[in-house]
């Protein structure tokens, strides 16, 4: 059975739009995962995160998987904010500058901690 025929691991609300999240999806079940560890599909409102590859060089896969999930959620927020109508990932000046998406995904836990410490949440 293909993973999209199953219940998602979770559904989240992204600016009023439900996104289904599928985690630990084998690359054999989704050809897009052959080239990446996760993606956000704005047309189907799905976030898909790959399973741990057999040839994994990372010492802490779980931490990396959480980072990939945060990264794809940032894309979902950008899509639902109206940024992403003509997204192309291989052209300079793309709709979602990957370096900024990466920065937000990496730094958000630290930003959240500071916001919580100062009572800004």
Show the residue positions of the predicted features.
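A positional/architectural concept
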Residues: 2-3
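Active-site scaffold of zinc-dependent metalloenzymes
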Residues: 8-65, 76-80, 84, 89-106, ...
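Long, well-structured alpha-helical subdomains associated
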Residues: 115-121
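Short, basic alpha-helical nucleic acid-contact segments in DNA-binding proteins
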Residues: 107-112
């Amino acid at each position: 059975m293909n993973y999209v025929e199953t219940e998602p691991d979770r559904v989240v609300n992204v600016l009023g739009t439900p996104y289904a999240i599928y985690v630990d999806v084998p690359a054999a079940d989704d050809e897009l995962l052959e080239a990446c560890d996760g993606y956000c599909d704005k047309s189907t409102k799905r976030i898909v995160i790959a399973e741990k590859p057999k040839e994994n060089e990372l010492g802490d896969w779980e931490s990396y998987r959480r980072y990939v999930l945060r990264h794809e959620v940032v894309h979902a927020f950008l899509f639902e904010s109206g940024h992403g109508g003509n997204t192309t990932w291989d052209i300079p000046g793309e709709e979602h500058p990957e370096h900024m998406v990466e920065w937000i995904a990496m730094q958000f836990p630290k930003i959240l901690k500071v916001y919580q410490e100062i009572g800004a949440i």
